[in-house]
Amino acid sequence: QVIGAGCGRTGTASLKAALEILGFPCYHMFEVVKHGHASWWHKAFTVGPADWGEPFDGFRATVDFPAAVAYPELMQRYPKAKVILSTRKSDSWAASVMETIWSPQGKERSWVGAPWNISFQRMGNAFRARFFRDADGGLTSGAIDDSEQLQALFNKWNAEVKAAVDPSRLLIFEVSQGWEPLCAFLGVPVPDVPFPRVNDTTEMKERIRAAHRHYI
């Protein structure tokens, strides 16, 4: 019912928590880790799945990587689903991803480039090949370590989503906006609880370190 097309590190963990409060069990990168879905996503991005709905059994929504980069396929698979483009300022997004999920430092490498888990490395290579493409269709070199290139890719991605999705089906959302625009878009009442704020940069870096400790 809800497809998240926004990049990771745009408040997707908070958005996941909010959607679940509203009654939409939500698939996130956390579920890829929990359910061992990395190999499925690698295959999906390289040869294509039998059914794009397969990993979402029991879920009513999805946000974050890797599913976000498959939003065109998910829109076809779920033609009545609404689309949320979670976003933030491009400079703060680039700073966040360089410190966390695409950190160049070996001890804090992300889920998507994890040298300690070959299935995640393959999945990461496959979905980054979709995201890290220049206007000519080739892979953009060096972008992972360059703030300006990352910002350009982020802005390009957001522009492509806005162009691809009918405005009546799309919510452009920053988690700082809180409940009102999200609930209005989904047609549900505003809950009597604070909007969740989770998974800041410090917390995410600790998640990555914990994953290393678990797998090494």
Question: Over which residues does each language-model region extend?
Answer:
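Short beta->alpha connector loops
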Residues: 8, 65-69, 176
